[in-house]
Amino acid sequence: LMDNIGNTFSAKTITDFLKNQGRKLSAETVYNYLRALESAFLIHKAVRFDIKGKRILETQEKYYLSDLGLRHAVIGYRDNDIAGVLENIVYLELLRRGWTVHIGKQDVAEVDFVANRTDERLYIQVCYVLTPENTEREFDPLEGNSDNDDKLVLTTDTLPRTIRDILRTHPTGSFSFEPSVYWRLH
């Protein structure tokens, strides 16, 4: 769980892994452990939300850690996990600001967060660094959503040049860009 922040969760994957290690554990037992971790406020569960169907889905949830320091203590710090860590930070910040947070499903694509608060809805994509290779993956799920709710791309990019290049590629007025550091400080 700590090694997979930002990824969808499957109890079957856990039970299959343990079975290969010579241990037997049911999916229900895995979920019991997860509920216990949630009750102890060590993890938070984000369920999937079908954006087109406007309904909660029962599978492929994600779990985020309440304290990333625990993760670093258990598995160590890894530079290559920074994208998942950033996603975890954004999730916790949305909760702190009073949003109810889901992960979004838009056809076959994923929107990192669908955040709801009273009459507001906000769609958020979190990306460590926007590159020509990942720009389409980050923007397409937001562009495929035709409602008028706010859409935000959070990235660690801070150079205005980067944002201008992206706007040239995706010339739409429906997106906000904000360096994640500044967004976190609001």
Label every model-predicted segment.
Residues 1-121:
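Accessory nucleic acid-recognition modules appended to NTPase machines
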Residues 64, 124, 152-154, 168-170:
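Hydrophobic/aromatic beta-strand patches that form the interior of the parallel beta-sheet core
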Residues 106, 148-165:
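Nucleic-acid nuclease catalytic cores
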